[in-house]
């Protein structure tokens, strides 16, 4: 059968540069859709020969949206290879900074990147289907969203002197103690931001209730789930063991990040620079899994803060206690995690050790290699470093959140295209739904390929004879 080809390049309101190609049959139905990551990966090679103590300042330059995640993962890998476990007060301060990262990133994505599609509508005029349109539609909600992100950034800057590329965590701990004035400033703002997170949760729950048909047909498919948990299988974002659960929610493995290569392999497709991680024992594609908010909430049994845990139980009831497979519920899970991060930040600020000056372990016992792991807002982030006797890096491997989710995004793009895109004249709103299949995962493509890219969007539609029949531009 003759086919048409539609190209969406780049996908907008995500971080980084990707495109989607939709191959259509002559009858206007979709044959297949592909998610291409076309930034070239190279950052790991740049790091070879550098001192491991430099990595917590080098790797955040991969990304301006989640620099704290790379900053902390690099420091944690440095702890391991230098044999210098961080003292408890330093771990508390690192985790507090990480909660700020989660708050600002989740808040920004829900309200400003993913939210416009939901609050304004997938078919809304693309010229204002963004934060500008949100300001016009609901200025009060938009102001709350901005203040929520500002609070997350304030946590980071209170600790690291600046919110972008902070200078704080180092192998063995952190480089300066916290102070009571900073603690008090942050504590005074938490109650307001908890209320904003509750508003966000109610917004997405109401939207899902009013759009249940879309929720139930928009990229719903089974996978495994992957992420950090506590020893009791509670949600963990800073440090813990990696838990991998199956499509039915049962536990498949629990292992230390130091041993991830024993359990995870990577599949390659010719149409993407980004590899596809999977669970070795099940093979490809049966071993594909999801990470990030939806993956983490399916992967944990409970949350150790009261408000977020109460919401988690409602979330888990959506599919009768089985894993929640609906891609659009990523937004709901994201706001539950935002609420947890706010509650957890309050717990950390109340800990007496948060003001301790015991913040750095200067002992050294070099190891040949080590892994740092953290739950970045978008999912599990692994930094694996190999060093020589001088502490110089001989090899670097970064497995980032968006890489873990590559299968899920590719599958979602294919399913959404087949469900919503109909020819012969393809509407902009149809293609925006395909973009949202990626956007819901909140991908950071500069992280996944360790590069940066941006360009205008143009969609070209070719008929079954290969002639250009339609052009859509943003």
Task: Write out the residue ranges for each language-model feature.
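A translation/RNA-centric and nucleic-acid-associated enzymatic feature enriched
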Residues: 378, 383-385, 395
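Active-site/pore-lining binding-face segments in mid-to-C-terminal subdomains
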Residues: 394-396, 400
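Active-site bordering "gate/hinge" segments
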Residues: 1-378, 400-474
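Active-site catalytic microenvironments in core metabolic enzymes, especially phosphate/sugar-handling
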Residues: 391
């Amino acid at each position: 059968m003759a086919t048409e080809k539609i190209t969406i390049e780049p996908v907008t309101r995500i971080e980084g540069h990707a495109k989607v190609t939709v191959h259509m049959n002559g009858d206007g139905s979709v044959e297949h859709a592909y998610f291409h990551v076309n930034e070239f990966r190279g950052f790991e090679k740049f790091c070879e020969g550098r001192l491991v103590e430099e990595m917590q300042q080098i790797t955040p330059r991969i990304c301006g949206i989640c620099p704290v995640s790379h900053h902390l993962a690099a420091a944690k890998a440095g702890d391991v290879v230098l044999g210098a476990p961080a003292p408890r007060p330093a771990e508390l301060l690192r985790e507090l900074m990480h909660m700020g990262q989660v708050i600002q990133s989740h808040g920004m994505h829900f309200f400003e990147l993913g939210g416009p599609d939901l609050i304004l509508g997938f078919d809304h005029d693309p010229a204002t289907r963004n934060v500008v349109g949100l300001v016009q539609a609901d200025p009060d909600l938009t102001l709350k969203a901005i203040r929520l992100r500002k609070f997350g950034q304030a946590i980071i800057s209170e600790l690291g002197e600046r919110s972008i590329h902070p200078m704080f965590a180092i192998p063995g701990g952190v480089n300066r103690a916290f102070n009571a004035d900073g603690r008090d400033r942050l504590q005074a703002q938490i109650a307001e931001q908890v209320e904003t997170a509750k508003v966000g949760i109610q917004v997405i729950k109401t939207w899902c209730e009013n759009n249940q048909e879309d929720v139930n047909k928009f990229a719903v498919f089974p996978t495994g789930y992957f992420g950090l948990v506590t020893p009791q299988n509670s949600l963990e974002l800073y440090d813990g063991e990696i838990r991998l659960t199956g499509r039915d929610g049962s536990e498949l493995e629990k292992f230390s990040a130091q041993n991830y290569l024993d359990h995870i392999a990577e599949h390659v497709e010719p149409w993407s620079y980004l590899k596809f991680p999977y669970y070795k024992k099940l093979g490809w594609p049966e071993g594909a899994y999801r990470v990030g908010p939806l993956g983490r909430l399916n992967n944990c049994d409970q949350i150790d803060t009261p408000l977020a845990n109460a919401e988690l139980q409602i979330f888990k009831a959506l599919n009768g206690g089985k894993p929640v497979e609906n891609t659009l519920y990523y937004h709901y899970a994201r706001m539950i995690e935002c609420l947890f991060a706010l509650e957890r930040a309050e717990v950390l600020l109340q800990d007496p050790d948060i003001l301790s000056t015991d913040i750095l372990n200067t002992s050294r016992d070099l190891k040949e290699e080590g892994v740092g792991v953290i739950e970045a807002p978008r999912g599990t982030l692994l930094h694996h470093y190999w060093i020589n006797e001088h502490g110089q890096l001989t090899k670097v491997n970064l497995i980032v959140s968006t890489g873990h989710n590559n299968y899920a995004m590719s599958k979602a793009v294919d399913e959404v295209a087949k469900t919503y895109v109909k020819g012969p004249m393809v509407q902009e709103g149809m293609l925006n739904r395909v973009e949202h299949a990626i956007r819901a995962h909140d991908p950071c493509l500069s992280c996944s390929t360790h590069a940066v890219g941006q360009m205008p969007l143009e969609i070209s539609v070719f008929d079954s004879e290969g002639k250009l029949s339609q052009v859509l531009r943003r």
